[in-house]
């Protein structure tokens, strides 16, 4: 299998590029061809007051009580129509009712239809006043949508809202196909609620019953309804056989939940996966609680742990109240560092190094905003679990623009850092940053002159253990004060490309920036939250080399760059390219000896960065970027991708990602950057392709190869068959799932998945390619 995936991908790429044959037809359109439509003029409003029209070969009656019609009888009122060989019409005066009760008995080849349903059988009855209708021993077919079946007795009730079946069946398969069906002693189809309720339900595949439930609900539309969703299963080398049976609970219009028992054979237990969504005045959010009571594999691998319970809690919330209050939560926590290696989860990955737990409350009015937050990290490393949390953090911004020709801003922050280890330094940091800008602009250019004053105070505690083991000592009280000055100028030139491409426009956008920040020795300040920022083209013009406030590098530098764009006659950007560099007049320093390049006195060093995008045609696109840093003496990072995308189901993408080991050491925490898997950096080439291979078959493949290790990094292959009443998806994935420090090699997981979806119950007729593309550990990202 591992050797065949690249070959299969190459075949898919070739057929996607050179096949000119379109899909035979849209699957939804094909399915609707087998569904009857209402072809008479639709009557709106109350039809009970409309006259009844009767056509027949023969008629006799006892006026006004009874009448008998025989021979091609056709009765119509509003949207309803009843046809039969013989019809008996009865009319009786009802006490207290202004209108007589009119009923119909129909015999022989009974056919009833309206704009909702068609009923056929040997015998029927109808109430012309209420539109209640009975048909015995017949079959039914929904109008304008999939859904049909048979029953001993079929009843229409509630102004055609309900179809009630006694000893009936239901399937969304088109006539001539009974691939699946549900039979029950009573079936009630509610068109308004878009649900079918079934008592003593037996689910059948063909003629074979495979599942029984005393009560079952099936959604027959796009409306939210409580009930079991379609189960699915897969096999992985991590957990062996896995089976999911999700239940959807429509709690209220503003909240719902999905409860999924997830059986894992190798773990010897059921994980309960509980997802809860809500919408309130304070915003919208999602919570997930997954719980595995015990895990026999974890017990064997971690015999010293007191508990083998495995769990995950995730909470995401975002909202605004009263237009001024803002509430945000981004919280993920798991029972142990191995959780995402052992279990697939959409809220985390085996490639993640940590989980974040952040709460924030903000207040914002014109010219002012303030946010109070707490932020913690759970590090997924058994070698180094040290991490800093901000408990709490206050951020304040005050803006006052148009103060004469100037714009002003004051930013302030106060934060207390706490470490998960008792022997690590902790600190309280207070920062104040007033800024004044002089913006000048016209229709072809702008220049912004900015001056800042950066004042930071640290009160550091718990320094004994660190100072006893390091030559550079930390001070308990540190004040750092520095000015910052920046001038940033941009121009935009534009020309028509009549000679080369009529209707197209090209721009040339040069940019130059001078930045000055004096040097301050920050070796007596511990690094609590700073890390090197990536220097892509836009990053060249940042005024900070590091994120956070603990490391503010000195700067005496000029950044220059140029961007060129090409727009078509519809003002759609077809091409852009950006190239820029930073020239350092003096070395950029912080005084931190742990930063490798600060040990070399390099003036005049350069950082180069370039980005490009080319929309070659409506179907072809190319993106790329590269950064070269003379301080690292190599290409720091680069990436490129080219994509052919005919539609969402037919695409091919080739991509390459690179990060040098020196760049990784400079940007990642030490306990990650020195890990064995990163010692040679990252160099991966990959391919992604998807394509319908027949009217109803689609295939998706992805393959990533590590050129440093000369081995596969990740691969995926998925195939889906889609019909009008069901879809079957089979997938295989081999993914990187961690690193074995004892054996010094990568750990892989092989997974085979199987999923069945009932079609015709909603408006989803997709070929499944996008779902399969997103399921990969390295999910597809659109280049166009």
Curated annotation (Swiss-Prot):
Residues 1-24 form the signal peptide. GO terms for biological process: Gram-negative-bacterium-type cell outer membrane assembly; lipopolysaccharide transport. Pfam families: LptD, LptD_N. Contains two intramolecular disulfide bonds. The keyword Membrane applies. It is found in: Cell outer membrane. It comes from the Bacteria. One of its GO terms (cellular component) is transporter complex. InterPro entries: LipoPS_assembly_LptD, LptD, LptD_C, OstA-like_N. Together with LptE, is involved in the assembly of lipopolysaccharide (LPS) at the surface of the outer membrane. Belongs to the LptD family. Component of the lipopolysaccharide transport and assembly complex. Interacts with LptE and LptA. PANTHER family: LPS-ASSEMBLY PROTEIN (PTHR30189), LPS-ASSEMBLY PROTEIN LPTD (PTHR30189:SF1). This is LPS-assembly protein LptD. It comes from Shigella flexneri. The lineage of its organism: Bacteria, Pseudomonadati, Pseudomonadota, Gammaproteobacteria, Enterobacterales.
């Amino acid at each position: 299998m591992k050797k065949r995936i690249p070959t299969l991908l190459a075949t898919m790429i070739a057929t996607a590029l050179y096949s000119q044959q379109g899909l035979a037809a849209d699957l939804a359109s094909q399915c609707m061809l087998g569904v009857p439509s209402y072809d008479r003029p639709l009557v709106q409003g109350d039809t009970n007051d409309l006259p009844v029209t009767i056509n027949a070969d023969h008629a006799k009656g006892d006026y006004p009580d009874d009448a008998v019609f025989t021979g091609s009888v056709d009765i119509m009122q509003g949207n309803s129509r009843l046809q039969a060989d013989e019809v008996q019409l009865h009319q009786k005066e009802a006490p207290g009712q202004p209108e007589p009760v009119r009923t119909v008995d129909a015999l022989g080849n009974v056919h009833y239809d309206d704009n909702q349903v068609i009923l056929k059988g040997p015998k029927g009855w109808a109430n012309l006043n209420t539109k209640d209708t009975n048909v015995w021993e017949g079959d039914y077919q929904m109008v304008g949508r999939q859904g049909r079946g048979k029953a001993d007795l079929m009843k229409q009730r509630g102004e055609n809202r309900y179809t009630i079946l006694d000893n009936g069946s239901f399937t969304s398969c088109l006539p001539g196909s009974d691939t699946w069906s549900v039979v029950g002693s009573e079936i009630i189809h509610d068109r308004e609620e878009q649900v079918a309720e079934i008592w003593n339900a037996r689910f059948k595949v063909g003629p074979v019953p495979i599942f029984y439930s005393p009560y079952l609900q099936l959604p027959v539309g796009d409306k939210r309804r409580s009930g079991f969703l379609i189960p699915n299963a897969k096999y992985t080398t991590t957990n062996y056989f896995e089976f999911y049976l999700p239940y959807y609970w429509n709690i209220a219009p503003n909240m719902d939940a999905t409860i999924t028992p997830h059986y894992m054979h190798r773990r010897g237990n059921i994980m309960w996966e509980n997802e809860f969504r809500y919408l309130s005045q304070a915003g919208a959010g999602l919570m997930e609680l997954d719980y595995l009571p015990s895990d026999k594999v974890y017990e064997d691998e971690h015999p010293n742990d007191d508990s083998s319970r495995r769990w995950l809690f995730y909470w995401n919330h975002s909202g605004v109240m009263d237009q001024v209050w803002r509430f945000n939560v981004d919280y993920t926590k798991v029972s142990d560092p191995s959780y995402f290696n052992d279990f697939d989860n959409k809220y985390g990955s085996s490639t993640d190094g940590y989980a974040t737990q952040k709460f924030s409350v903000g207040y914002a009015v014109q010219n002012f905003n303030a946010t109070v937050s707490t932020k913690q990290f759970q590090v997924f490393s058994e070698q180094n679990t040290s991490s800093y949390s901000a408990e709490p953090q206050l951020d304040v911004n005050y803006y006052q623009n148009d103060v004469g020709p100037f714009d002003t801003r004051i930013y302030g922050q106060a934060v207390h850092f706490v470490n998960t280890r008792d022997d690590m330094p902790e600190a309280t940091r207070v920062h104040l940053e007033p800024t004044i800008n002089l913006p000048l602009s016209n229709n072809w250019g702008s220049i912004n002159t900015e001056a800042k004053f950066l004042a930071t105070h640290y009160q550091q505690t718990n320094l004994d253990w660190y100072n006893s083991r390091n030559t550079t000592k930390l001070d308990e009280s540190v004040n750092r004060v520095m000015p910052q000055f920046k001038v940033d100028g941009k121009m935009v030139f534009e020309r028509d490309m009549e000679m080369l491409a009529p209707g197209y426009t090209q721009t040339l956008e040069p940019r130059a920036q001078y930045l000055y920040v004096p040097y301050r020795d920050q070796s007596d300040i511990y690094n609590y939250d700073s890390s090197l920022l990536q220097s892509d083209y836009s990053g060249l013009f940042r005024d900070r080399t590091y994120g956070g406030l603990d490391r503010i590098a000195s700067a005496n530098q000029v950044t220059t760059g140029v961007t060129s764009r090409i727009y078509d006659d519809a003002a759609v950007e077809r091409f852009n390219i950006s190239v820029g560099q930073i020239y350092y007049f003096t070395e950029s320093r912080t005084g931190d000896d742990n930063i490798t390049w600060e040990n070399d006195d390099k003036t005049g060093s350069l950082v180069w960065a370039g980005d490009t995008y080319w929309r070659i045609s409506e179907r072809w696109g190319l993106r790329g970027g590269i950064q070269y840093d003379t301080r690292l003496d190599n290409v720091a990072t680069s990436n490129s991708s080219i994509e052919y995308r005919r539609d969402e189901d037919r695409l091919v993408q080739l991509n390459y990602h690179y990060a040098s080991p020196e760049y990784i050491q400079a940007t990642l925490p030490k306990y990650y950057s020195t890990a064995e898997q990163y010692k040679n950096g990252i160099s991966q080439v990959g391919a992604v392709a998807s394509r319908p291979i027949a009217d109803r078959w689609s295939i998706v493949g992805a393959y990533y190869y590590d050129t440093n290790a000369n081995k596969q990094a990740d691969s995926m292959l998925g195939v889906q068959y889609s019909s009008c009443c069901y879809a079957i998806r089979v997938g295989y994935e081999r993914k990187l799932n961690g690193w074995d420090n004892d054996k010094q090699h990568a750990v892989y997981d092989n997974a085979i998945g199987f999923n069945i979806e009932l079609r015709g119950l909603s408006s989803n007729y997709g070929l499944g390619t996008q779902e399969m593309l997103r399921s990969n550990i390295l999910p597809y990202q659109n280049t166009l």
